[in-house]
């Protein structure tokens, strides 16, 4: 079986770390053990520096990061990760499990920020070509639930400090995109934890079995 790229998406506090652990456990039970893990923005030395610039509220002092500058920094970090880590790993037969990918930009910047969606799609295609995840697990949670969980973890980053309206727009765009793409599977992350974990296990198991069919 050819190696695959699985991405976990969702608002802050959706439970992406727990989901990643469940995905790994499920893949291992299915005999898949050669995996690497990525996060966006980040995952390479350069991409981590860009992560600090775009997320650390103190990194640029009083200077306001414009919406378009934010988008371009996300894409700079993304293409560096894709070209230097993800594609080489897949070519070597290693599965890649990612914490966020391009769907985040389409939802956060296209939905939350209200940036023109055609422009974002054009930029994505110019930077990434036809490269896409094989499977995306979107953990759907309301901003009220997600941000309560995120705030319980401690200090929030620059984007986590946005308004509920921002996150409602982001969630709406996530759901819209998920409805348009069969490779995106929506998981109700407001359920009890064990139910969420069971849904992830079932989704991943069925998907891998279909690959073997």
UniProtKB/Swiss-Prot annotation:
<dbReference type="InterPro" id="IPR039430">
    <property type="entry name" value="Thymidylate_kin-like_dom"/>
</dbReference>
<dbReference type="GO" id="GO:0006227">
    <property type="term" value="P:dUDP biosynthetic process"/>
</dbReference>
<keyword id="KW-0545">Nucleotide biosynthesis</keyword>
<keyword id="KW-0067">ATP-binding</keyword>
<feature type="binding site">
    <location>
        <begin position="10"/>
        <end position="17"/>
    </location>
    <ligand>
        <name>ATP</name>
    </ligand>
</feature>
<protein>
    <recommendedName>
        <fullName>Thymidylate kinase</fullName>
        <ecNumber>2.7.4.9</ecNumber>
    </recommendedName>
</protein>
<dbReference type="GO" id="GO:0006235">
    <property type="term" value="P:dTTP biosynthetic process"/>
</dbReference>
<dbReference type="GO" id="GO:0005829">
    <property type="term" value="C:cytosol"/>
</dbReference>
<dbReference type="InterPro" id="IPR018095">
    <property type="entry name" value="Thymidylate_kin_CS"/>
</dbReference>
<comment type="similarity">
    <text>Belongs to the thymidylate kinase family.</text>
</comment>
<comment type="function">
    <text>Phosphorylation of dTMP to form dTDP in both de novo and salvage pathways of dTTP synthesis.</text>
</comment>
<keyword id="KW-0547">Nucleotide-binding</keyword>
<dbReference type="InterPro" id="IPR027417">
    <property type="entry name" value="P-loop_NTPase"/>
</dbReference>
<dbReference type="GO" id="GO:0004798">
    <property type="term" value="F:dTMP kinase activity"/>
</dbReference>
<keyword id="KW-0808">Transferase</keyword>
<dbReference type="Pfam" id="PF02223">
    <property type="entry name" value="Thymidylate_kin"/>
</dbReference>
<dbReference type="InterPro" id="IPR018094">
    <property type="entry name" value="Thymidylate_kinase"/>
</dbReference>
<dbReference type="GO" id="GO:0005524">
    <property type="term" value="F:ATP binding"/>
</dbReference>
<dbReference type="GO" id="GO:0006233">
    <property type="term" value="P:dTDP biosynthetic process"/>
</dbReference>
<keyword id="KW-0418">Kinase</keyword>
